[in-house]
């Protein structure tokens, strides 16, 4: 990936904040493996740089959603353990073995198909984590009998390693009894068979709110990057997480709308008086969505309104007269109390902070900050 970029919109990623959040989880669960979830390009931050920095700060295990994501990490020198949380097509099983990637077993049928697709040329081990469906209703085995049968099948093959068992909480970030019920169901099922090396069930919310002594690994995702899974979790815990992302654009042009003149598609904004506007080279193709019309951005310390429709590549802001081309504009801030925090943006978009981060597209350069050091990743100029 290139260390150059040629546009006036980019993300700032604070790697020290990510490392600090990782340490929070290591401290909360000192006897557990912190399985850092870096799927979805590390929730938009950039999986390679994030994983590399986390390894330098003690991470030994990563989780991703797809084999492609795992191979990307391997291609960039990430040697730690990697678990694919999603379902790999059975025909691609040799690729997982080749790249030393652990896989999720979602069903007995999948395991049988996977075994059929292991070529005779493969002599390396295949690590497997069995997924139990304790209430999420998505992937996983729902009954103890099938779980035991899957373990028995794995044990018949010297090449296969029953490395882990896990489940996923549906409502850990909300009040109620469901998470406790899921945890109990998980323990009951796991206790009916031999135990593997890794037993894990806690996502970010579960890791922040629950002890789960039965388990020896946790899977924090969103909170590694400094964000609470919900307002409920933020209010319940005393743990301080450091937000790690800023979205910045520099003004490329200013101009004056006269009274009666409109701007952007649909002419949804018409000036009633002479109005100075600033054009920002960022739009919904970058993840700054059309619904952000009417929201506010930070221009030189001033809260300035986004006017007119947000375009694919441009956003228009009503600004003070003294604003000029080149001035920096904060669209997403890394301060929790900021009017541009990820949570405020998520509320404006009628969504959750996860989606705001994951929407930040690959065409945005990522500028990584590690103390005084600065690194640039531009995925478009590989």
Curated annotation (Swiss-Prot):
Binding annotation for substrate: 138, 312
Pathway note: Amino-acid biosynthesis; D-alanine biosynthesis; D-alanine from L-alanine: step 1/1
Coiled-coil intervals, chain numbering: none
Its EC number(s): 5.1.1.1
Catalyzed chemical reaction(s): L-alanine = D-alanine
Positions annotated as active site in the UniProt record: 39 (proton acceptor), 265 (proton acceptor)
Function text: Catalyzes the interconversion of L-alanine and D-alanine. May also act on other amino acids.
The name this protein goes by in its record: Alanine racemase 1
Gene name in the database record: alr1
């Amino acid at each position: 990936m290139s260390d150059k970029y040629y546009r006036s919109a980019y993300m700032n990623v604070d790697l020290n904040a990510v490392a600090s959040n990782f340490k929070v989880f290591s401290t909360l669960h000192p006897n557990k493996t912190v399985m850092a979830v870096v799927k979805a390009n590390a929730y938009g931050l950039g999986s390679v740089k994030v994983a590399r920095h986390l390894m330098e700060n003690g991470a030994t295990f990563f989780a991703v959603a797809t084999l492609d994501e795992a191979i990307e990490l391997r291609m960039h020198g990430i040697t730690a353990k990697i678990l694919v949380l999603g379902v790999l097509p059975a025909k691609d099983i040799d690729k997982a073995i080749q790249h030393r990637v652990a896989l999720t077993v979602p069903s007995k049928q999948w395991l049988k198909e996977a075994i059929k697709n292991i070529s005779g040329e493969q002599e390396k081990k295949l690590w497997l984590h069995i997924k139990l469906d304790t209430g999420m209703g998505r992937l996983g085995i729902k009954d103890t009998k099938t779980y035991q049968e899957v373990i028995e099948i794995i044990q018949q093959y010297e090449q296969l390693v029953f490395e882990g068992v896990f489940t996923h909480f549906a409502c850990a970030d909300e009040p109620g009894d469901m998470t406790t019920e899921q945890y109990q169901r998980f323990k009951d099922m796991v206790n009916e068979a031999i135990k593997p090396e890794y037993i894990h069930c806690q996502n970010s919310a579960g890791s922040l709110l629950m002890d789960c002594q039965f388990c020896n690994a946790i899977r924090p995702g969103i909170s590694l990057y400094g964000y609470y899974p919900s307002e409920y979790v933020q209010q319940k815990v005393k743990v301080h997480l450091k937000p790690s992302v800023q979205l910045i654009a520099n003004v490329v042009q200013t101009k004056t709308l006269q009274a009666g003149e409109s701007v952007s598609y649909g002419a949804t904004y018409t000036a009633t008086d002479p109005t100075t506007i600033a054009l920002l080279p960022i739009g919904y193709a970058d993840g700054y969505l059309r619904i952000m019309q009417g929201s506010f951005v930070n221009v030189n310390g001033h809260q300035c309104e986004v006017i007119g429709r947000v375009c694919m590549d441009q956003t228009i802001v009503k600004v003070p007269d003294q604003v000029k081309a080149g001035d920096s504009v904060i669209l997403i801030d890394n301060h929790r109390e900021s009017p541009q925090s990820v949570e405020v943006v998520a509320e404006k978009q009628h969504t959750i902070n996860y989606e705001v981060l994951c929407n930040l597209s690959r065409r945005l350069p990522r500028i990584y900050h590690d103390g005084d050091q600065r690194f640039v990743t531009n995925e478009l100029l590989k």
